[in-house]
Amino acid sequence: MAKPLTERFYQPKELKVMGRWSVEDVVVNDPSLRPYINLEPRILPHSHGRHAKKPFGKAQVHIVERLINKVMRSGASSHKVGGHFMRREHRSLMGKKMKAYEVVKEAFMIIERRTKQNPIQVFIRAIENSAPREDTTTIAFGGIRYHMAVDVSPLRRLDIALKNIALGASAKCYRNKTSYAQALAEEIIAAANKDPKSFAYSKKEEIERIAQSSR
């Protein structure tokens, strides 16, 4: 008679992200972002792109995996970030998810060493502080274009925050000796502390300031 699955396979008592950090005590304070931040216990944050063709499928992707996916970007190509065009920078990470995974893991280890806190909780706080609540859109009336303030959906707020955190890290290590993991850790810590040195946090403040003037 075959043994039950619980006896045939090893089952850890607690699944930790990357085998190191628990998500049981991680708290999302922003009620609008809470349904879209996936914190399911998972050792390897990798969904194999199953969400790609599903509407709002990325809301089911683990938040750490979403950061890894943003790290694989090549940087801004149509506008300057930190005074530079960063097209094709960090191209060694493009399409190489395992390498991006190791970069994010190293960044989280740096955050844990510096803050003495769970790096996933620090990362969540950075997202909450970097997600703009208001933005502007262009409307045409009588052949004239106007900027109008609009509310930002929770999923887009999350997208903007993750994008700017990754771009801020790219800007910090652009053409200098700072590693990408170290730059990513510094960006996340600064955003979590609402430090104006954070690209993501300062960008959020700029977006909301422009939206406020367009009311």
UniProtKB/Swiss-Prot annotation:
Instruction: Provide an example Pfam family for this protein.
Output: Ribosomal_S7
Q: Name one GO cellular component term.
A: small ribosomal subunit
Which keywords are on file for this protein?
Ribonucleoprotein, Ribosomal protein, RNA-binding, rRNA-binding
Q: Annotated Gene Ontology MF terms?
A: rRNA binding; structural constituent of ribosome
Top-level taxonomic group: Archaea
Q: What SUPFAM superfamilies does the entry give?
A: Ribosomal protein S7
Q: Fetch the InterPro entries from UniProt.
A: Ribosomal_uS7, Ribosomal_uS7_arc, Ribosomal_uS7_dom, Ribosomal_uS7_dom_sf, Ribosomal_uS7_euk/arc
Q: What processes in GO biological process is this protein linked to? A: translation
Classification via CDD domains: uS7_Eukaryote (cd14867)
Gene3D superfamilies this protein is in?
Answer: Ribosomal protein S7 domain
> Is Protease one of the keywords UniProt gives this record?
no
Q: What's the subunit arrangement here?
A: Part of the 30S ribosomal subunit.
- Record function comment: One of the primary rRNA binding proteins, it binds directly to 16S rRNA where it nucleates assembly of the head domain of the 30S subunit. Is located at the subunit interface close to the decoding center.
Q: Which HAMAP family match?
A: Ribosomal_uS7_A
Q: Which family does it belong to?
A: Belongs to the universal ribosomal protein uS7 family.
Query: What protein is this chain from?
Result: Small ribosomal subunit protein uS7
